[in-house]
From Swiss-Prot:
It comes from the Eukaryota. GO terms for cellular component: apoplast. Belongs to the germin family. InterPro entries: Cupin_1 (IPR006045), Germin (IPR001929), Germin_Mn-BS (IPR019780), RmlC-like_jellyroll (IPR014710), RmlC_Cupin_sf (IPR011051). Residues 1-22 form the signal peptide. The gene is GLP. GO terms for molecular function: manganese ion binding. Keywords: Apoplast, Disulfide bond, Manganese, Metal-binding, Secreted, Signal. This is Germin-like protein.
Amino acid sequence: MVMMRIFFFLFLLAFPVFTANASVNDFCVANGPGARDTPSGFVCKNTAKVTAADFVYSGLAKPGNTTNIINAAVTPAFVGQFPGVIGLGVTLARLDLAPGGVIPMHTHPGASEILNVVEGTILAAFISSGNKVYEKALYPGDVMVFPQGLLDFQEITGKIAPGLCELRQRNPGLQILEFQHCFPTIFPPKTIAGTTCLDEATIKKLKSGLGGTN
């Protein structure tokens, strides 16, 4: 099976609260992978202990596991994985799509997004707060922007589709509606049916496939 890959490069918006440490100092390396964010921000690693390795991340070298219901995988390099990006207004992630892969309807609550197609064809769209759909087939060299917080999706329509994506935020967040709000949850099928216009049999099937309970 030919693997289709998209590489997402995510650049973060330099809000003052997020970049305070980097504004005062040359940089702020979070104190280790998985460092916890606090109301006052991340704790910076002692600069005397910072090395070049803190500004290098190799976690995107390996393709993500696309053996799942959406035939896709996202491998992030946000501050939780890449401590060196804190306060710099830049981060990245990798997206791998297998044949038939799709990134379902989702939103980045804290980030706008830019997608650049390198090869292949991608169908991309977002929905405005006025419920207007902006949809476009993207070809190599095309760039599409997705406003912050709006629902959007990407679907592979060609055989291969590497691309670049930028997200304007330090830790852009990702909420995939089907995964986080409906089907994997403990909400009973009847409740979800009343809010999605899907029949209960379909909902039970989706919940089962996404690890939810009926």
